[in-house]
Amino acid sequence: MAMPDAEVEVNGGVVVYEFVGPEDGEVVVLTPGGRFSKDYGGVHELAEALAAGGKRVLLWDRPNCGRSDVQLYGRSESHMRAETLGVMLEKLGIEKVVAAGGSGGARDMIVFTMMYPEKVTKLLTWCIVGGTFSTMSLAGVYVLPELRAVRAGGIEAVLSIPGAAGSWADLCEANPRNKERLLEVGAEEFERVMERWFDAYIPKANEAIPGVADWEFAQVQVPTLIVRGGAKDYDHPARTSREVLSLIEGARLIEPPWPEDAWEQRGLRRRSGEEVGFEFWVDGAPSFLAFIDEQSTGGAVA
């Protein structure tokens, strides 16, 4: 049911994507988290499950993920990716989508829905990052190592640092163009962008999720389903999912369709040396399909 990978140029960079599912199916953009590619564990499994329910799933390597070209612009990395997706859909001739994402992908899809409300029919999010601990943790994953490296040794130093959720070196290995693109950006501009993106990961009283002011959630006017964060999942707190629920009029919160400790168990397995991804996400497919297939007269979910 999967089609071969394809490429489209957006804002001077190549985006790698594929479709899974019937050509006449309702389009669902499925977006994972981290700097992980569309081929990361568990992503295709969920896509196939949604496709089995008649959906046409668009999987994409977001800029700075997988085999797509790196991009360094925008208010935050999520805003850059949201703009990329908006232009990409226009080039592909796709007018409306269900925006679905987990972890960092949830943030990307929330921002996309705010920036392109005319393109989104429904919003579906899970494993949402927020709160002081997880927001500051993201700074330590995505920008602080980069800032230290570029200030100490330029772009070449950035290419040598490891990444807990994917690294720039990984991106260059997956796509040789990326090393040249980073060198062309140069240390000064790279540092400037990292400083701007860093601001999103400074916890603020009026930001339930990193880099998005609470007042901006009023722009989300589509039926929205939120999966509650795990009780002990400090990276995707239950509190954050409830805060987002309170900010989107009419949104619905459901209990996790996977084990309560799925994220913690994933961490234990990774620390033991096992290669694991987002395999538990496929457990959400029945709930996700039921939500997507609900008839709506517009506006948010009652």
Residues of each region from the PLM?
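Conserved HGGG/HGGXW glycine-rich cap/lid loop of the alpha/beta-hydrolase fold
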Residues: 13-69
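Conserved acidic catalytic loop of the alpha/beta-hydrolase fold
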Residues: 80-97
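Gly/Ala-rich beta-loop-alpha elbow adjacent to hydrolase catalytic centers
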Residues: 101-105, 109
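Flexible "cap/lid" loop of the alpha/beta hydrolase fold
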Residues: 110, 114-115, 121-151
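Hydrophobic, aromatic-rich cap/lid helix
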Residues: 178-213
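Short beta-strand/loop motif that positions the catalytic acidic residue
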Residues: 220, 226-228
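Conserved alpha/beta-hydrolase "acid-adjacent" motif
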Residues: 233-240
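Catalytic active-site module of serine/aspartate enzymes centered on a nucleophile-bearing elbow/loop
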Residues: 250-302
